[in-house]
Amino acid sequence: MYWKNAWWVGTVYSSCEPIELPEGMLISKQYETYPITTVSKAIYKQMCYRNCIPVLNTNVGFVIDTFAKPLPIVSQSWREFTKDSLRGSFAYSVVSIIYAIAVSAVIIWFLTIFVLTNYTIKPSWLLKTSTILSTVYILVVVIKSILILHGQQRDGYLHGAKLLSELNDYNPIQIIDLIVVLLLQINQVQIIMRIFQRQKDKRMALLIGIVATLASQVIWAIAQFYTPADANEASDILPAFIYLVRIAMALCYAAIITVFFISKIQIILANKKIWLLTLLTFILIYSPVAFFVADVSNAFVYELSEIFSVVNYVIGVVIPWEWCNKFNLIMKAKEKEGVLGRRFYEDELYELDRFELFVEEQMPEDEDNGDTHSDSPGNELNGGAHHNSQEQSDRLIGSNSPTNKPHNGNNTDPTSRFRQLLTNTKDAFLTLTDNIIAAGFAIPRSVSVSTQSLTGRYRNNSTARTEYTKEVVPDFSPEMFLQPEGSSHITETLSEQNAAPSTTNSNHRRRNVYVYSRKEVILDVSSDE
């Protein structure tokens, strides 16, 4: 970044310039290899960062205090450097950077262990992979930091800015950082998808999130790994631009979760168990924004924010994921208290309707009883209502059923073939996204495209179980069908009206349906009514 590389450049301290020494003796620590010699004139060049900033000398207690005093010009430059609140204070020393790296490692390792040992609600494979790679990333950073500090100590100095510069220029760390941040940003998309309830909103969040994540990481990789031959404005603007893009994405992520908190504030306030977790989530999702504000006020914090960037992503993923788990448990308990259960949305209703879950199939009327049913005015009213519902269901099935779609195989019209191609592409894309949402992101739905894990007993065991004749039948206990005496005739009437043959051509459309739970509802209607 432009200001990251330029903020150290300024006035050159006097101790970093070549110092002319008068006649004297030259003493080396390796006196066996380099014996003591007498020189008439010498030029001394002190180790400095970017040839302008003095560094911490590790030989002060060994050489200077024992054999000689420091040069006056060196002591004066060090006092001037440490008095500078921007560069030489303790907050920007190598000690604070070591503490920052150590704290980051502890936080990431703790959250990784928390994710891997969470047996109540198992996290997705994407979250597990991201946290494990984050652990590998911080482990590489710690090992590389130890090697760099060991080299500095061997050369007789310690400097935090040089440590950060070498860490940022180390390609293996940059490659792992690219992969880890990409996966963690996709995890943020996963959490946003868990907030939305409609499948249409989840698909849109998946599409927009994946595109934004890939675009930001590609630009970041270009800014990190591509060095233009000629220095121009693009080489300075691109790193700053991608930095602002990451901050904007983090702000959008935090804003979406905040809006969801506000919309569910009554449920949150009614459950004291998630108060602390909600407050912690609300604070931690804004940590990248806090680092950005600190960066604007003080440019050096950007160096520390690069160390904490992966930590911010891990915290911003694991804590909201756990909050979503707790909140979903509360919502499931609330839905169990009601009769209707969870709500269905329009896109789910149309998808469920092609499985004919909401279609009341009418028995074919016998020719002998045709006049008898038409004599009763009540039956006429019920028949009209049932006819209207049957027309509506037939209309829905006609638009969604694969058997009623026109066959354009022999149609040579380019427009029809193009429309058919678009339809097939759309169906394939929706199937792919639904598989990713259900399998990869561990976001279950009421209706899934796979029934491999669903077990049940089949009707007509003696017949051949072909692909289009399988029907999963849940096991019901006999006690569920016990009705009061007064409502027995109502049950018989409803069963006669809603009975349907089990061997229909639409049975194959009732496959691929998950039944997560069922609730027994008994309507006690007296015989007088």
From Swiss-Prot:
| Record field: transmembrane | 97-117, 131-151, 173-193, 205-225, 242-262, 274-294, 299-319
Domain of life of the organism in this record? Eukaryota
Provide the GO biological process annotations. Answer: cellular response to alkaline pH; cellular response to lithium ion; cellular response to neutral pH; cellular response to pH; filamentous growth; filamentous growth of a population of unicellular organisms in response to neutral pH
Which cell locations does it reside in?
Answer: Membrane
Query: What species is given as this protein's source?
Result: Candida albicans (strain SC5314 / ATCC MYA-2876)
Q: Where is this region: Disordered?
A: 364-417
| PANTHER family noted in UniProt | PH-RESPONSE REGULATOR PROTEIN PALH/RIM21 (PTHR35779), PH-RESPONSE REGULATOR PROTEIN PALH_RIM21 (PTHR35779:SF1)
This chain belongs to the protein called pH-response regulator protein palH/RIM21
Family that this chain belongs to: Belongs to the palH/RIM21 family.
